[in-house]
Amino acid sequence: QPPTLALFYLYHTLLDGDSDVLWCEYLMDRGVLDRAVFEPRNRAIEAGYKAGTVGVLEFCGFYVGTLAGRTPAQWQPLREDFLHERIVPRLLAAGRACIEAHRRDGHELVLTTATNHFLTELTAAALGIGHLIATECDIGIDGRFSGAVAGTPNMREGKVARLSEWLAARGRKLA
């Protein structure tokens, strides 16, 4: 009998906030993104998504696009600083307690999030969660993030599809 899965959603359950929003704010504060250009585009994409005129792929792609043009190694120092400065202080005590309760019960812990894997893998590690299902970033043949989503975004109905794929890779399926 495989262990019971404990699936955790990140935003406003384990984290006070949204990683994509926090990442963009962090990049604007560091001057990596031009606030005068990026903020209006961000507001427009969020409004379009809420209005139903922007789809999941375009929405996720907008945030994945913040990584475009650099390699994972080039982003690493900023990613680590982002984790310690913006994420760790916002990890909720109640969320950590819930994780620990499931861990004590022997459950298999899985973090599932629409934010990209590159940003959230450090968050999963900081929470002691060994499995992460997240939106994947495309990396070009030059080793740089292309700015595109790879595969199905882990958002809305894509979360069920991605969980099913994750389970199938482990010889399991949704009940």
Over which residues does each language-model region extend?
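Active-site neighborhood of HAD-like aspartate-dependent phosphohydrolases
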Residues: 1-51
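An amphipathic alpha-helix signature
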Residues: 20-21, 72, 76
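Short, compositionally biased "basic patch" segments
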Residues: 46-72, 132-140
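C-terminal cap/substrate-recognition subdomain and adjoining C-terminal extension
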Residues: 3, 77-80, 84-175
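Acidic/polar active-site rim loop that often engages polyanionic ligands
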Residues: 20-23, 59-60, 142-148
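Helix N-cap/coil-helix junction residues
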Residues: 32-33, 53, 129, 172
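Electropositive phosphate-/nucleotide-binding environments in soluble metabolic enzymes
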Residues: 17, 39, 53, 57, ...
